[in-house]
Amino acid sequence: DSYLISAISNDISYDQIFKLQAERYMNKEDILILISSSGNSKNIKEVLRFCNKKKLKTIGFSNFSGGYLAKHSNISIHSKIDNYGIGEDINHILMHLLMQFIAKSNLNTNKKKIIL
């Protein structure tokens, strides 16, 4: 929600844009997917600390050294690439693969649905 992101970053702090949304909207059965080239952005660290404290599930996509995100995500998908463009392309491909997996999983179960 771009309006919510603008409001939080302008009125509170850009460092809190993801954490405040996770606090309000995440449930125990949710999985938060985090994407960061360095893995060290303060807003990524803040939401990851919150999720780990609340035992919420996280998947981190990172590049370069992976940083905090690679070390503290429940599942870390790290591409040791030192180029932003290539790293972002790899993350896009991995996200497409993940979304295809989720979409196919939705077709084969009567359990809770994953909403895309």
Spans of model-derived segments:
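Glycine-rich phosphate-binding loops that contact phosphosugars or nucleotide phosphates
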Residues: 1-113
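Catalytic core of pol beta-like nucleotidyltransferases
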Residues: 116
